[in-house]
């Protein structure tokens, strides 16, 4: 019962990606594409484990989880290449490419885009009041602003201190 309730709270992009993954899994099974099949199953398993752990069901959380999976695959491929295991490195590289395809399909802004928007936002605040305290800026960053930027509030808030120093301490 609770799983269905949690799925109800998921964002549309979250549900769309899950549907896409399930359709792609079925296609990979029909085509007998084992690489894609096992990678998609791994993605679905990781997402399910994240849901069980109580993770938010948003595109931002999915981006974080899938980004972590890509990083793990890239690191593993590098390790395998150092150990002269090119066969295993190739498998990890292919898996990371498959996962990247799904990360790119999410409507999430890149760090550069967020930084650019945040810089513009902070410059507007400075133009209105050059003595604005960083705490007041944190209060202005809410879920609505974050979703309109295509970013998680936590990602935006993690960038505020360094940009605040650059802009307000000039």
From Swiss-Prot:
The keyword Phosphoprotein does not apply. It comes from the Eukaryota. Gene3D superfamilies: Uncharacterised protein YqeY/AIM41 PF09424, N-terminal domain (1.10.1510.10). It holds the Pfam family YqeY. One of its GO terms (cellular component) is mitochondrion. GO terms for molecular function: carbon-nitrogen ligase activity, with glutamine as amido-N-donor. Its main location: mitochondrion. The keyword Transit peptide applies. It is found in: Mitochondrion. Keywords: Mitochondrion, Transit peptide. Belongs to the AIM41 family. This is Altered inheritance of mitochondria protein 41, mitochondrial.
């Amino acid at each position: 019962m609770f799983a269905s309730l949690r799925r109800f709270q998921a964002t549309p992009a979250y549900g769309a990606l899950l549907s896409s993954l399930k359709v792609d899994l079925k296609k990979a099974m029909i085509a007998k594409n084992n690489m894609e099949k096992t990678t998609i199953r791994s993605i679905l398993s990781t997402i399910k484990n994240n849901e069980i752990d109580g993770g938010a069901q948003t595109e931002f959380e999915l981006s974080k989880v899938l980004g972590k999976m890509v990083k793990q695959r890239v690191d593993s491929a590098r390790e395998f290449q150092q150990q002269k295991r090119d066969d295993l490195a190739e498998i990890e590289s292919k898996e990371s490419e498959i996962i990247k395809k799904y990360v790119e399909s999410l409507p999430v802004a890149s760090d550069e885009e967020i930084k650019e928007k945040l810089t513009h936002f902070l410059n507007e605040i400075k133009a209105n009041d050059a003595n604005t305290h960083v705490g007041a800026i944190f209060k202005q960053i809410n879920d609505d602003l974050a979703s309109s930027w295509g970013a998680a509030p936590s990602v935006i808030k993690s960038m505020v201190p360094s940009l605040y120093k650059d802009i307000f301490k000039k």
